[in-house]
Amino acid sequence: MGRRPARCYRYCKNKPYPKSRFCRGVPDPKIRIFDLGRKKAKVDEFPLCAHMVSDEYEQLSSEALEAARICANKYMVKTCGKDGFHIRVRLHPFHVIRINKMLSCAGADRLQTGMRGAFGKPQGTVARVHIGQVIMSVRTKAQNKEHVIEALRRAKFKFPGRQKIHVSKKYGFTKFNTCDFDNMLAEKRLIPDGCGVKYIPSRGPLSRWKALHAN
């Protein structure tokens, strides 16, 4: 018996139902890798960031997330090289979906109880996504802008509903605007830390501030 189509589980009807000691025997999600590309690239190497944003309140299956990840990665590797980008899938499939299996063979009415005791067995996992929530983000060099938009456009076809592609005003995966980022870095208010930055507030011990600016 094949997998039930994901259109049956598209809408968020019930409360979140995660894997727990009460909900056991859940199959592993199809998506296992959430960061790919050159994920150890420093923050200043990939200034451009683009997001795929959901326009609907719905559920996305782990199979769809994996298919979109593969699709975007394949196009970006072909156009920008395997070290020219960093993709991050921002959704994790924690919600467990159930199926109440029905027999369709001869004499099935003797074996099954129909809708009596209809609480189903775990079938798979989905991610619940809200309107305006980011599904997938890509950071890369500024000259690859068109390639990023095309990669996300292709990945959109793996999902139901409507998604929008948004080119961010922020610098890479940080929360700071591109126009302010270089100035804050020069003033040592930001310190690069992997693919992100540490923000140094303007208050605290004077000795720490002097030690920071002495370097």
Swiss-Prot record:
Cytoplasm in keyword set: yes
Major place of residence: cytoplasm
CDD domains recorded: Ribosomal_L16_L10e
Coiled-coil stretches: none
GO molecular function, a single term: structural constituent of ribosome
Annotated transmembrane regions: none
A Gene Ontology BP annotation from the UniProt entry: brain development
Keywords: Cytoplasm, Developmental protein, Ribonucleoprotein, Ribosomal protein
Loss of function: phenotype: Morpholino knockdown of the protein decreases head size, but not body length at 2 days post-fertilization (dpf). Show decreased formation of actively translating ribosomes.
Tagged with keyword Protein biosynthesis: no
PROSITE patterns given in the database record: RIBOSOMAL_L10E
Domain of life, source organism: Eukaryota
InterPro entries in UniProt: Ribosomal_uL16 (IPR047873), Ribosomal_uL16_CS_euk_arc (IPR018255), Ribosomal_uL16_dom (IPR016180), Ribosomal_uL16_euk_arch (IPR001197), Ribosomal_uL16_sf (IPR036920)
Record's subunit section: Component of the large ribosomal subunit.
Family to which this protein belongs: Belongs to the universal ribosomal protein uL16 family.
Function description: Component of the large ribosomal subunit. Plays a role in the formation of actively translating ribosomes. Plays a role in the embryonic brain development.
Entry protein name: Large ribosomal subunit protein uL16
Organism: Danio rerio
Organism phylogeny: Eukaryota, Metazoa, Chordata, Craniata, Vertebrata
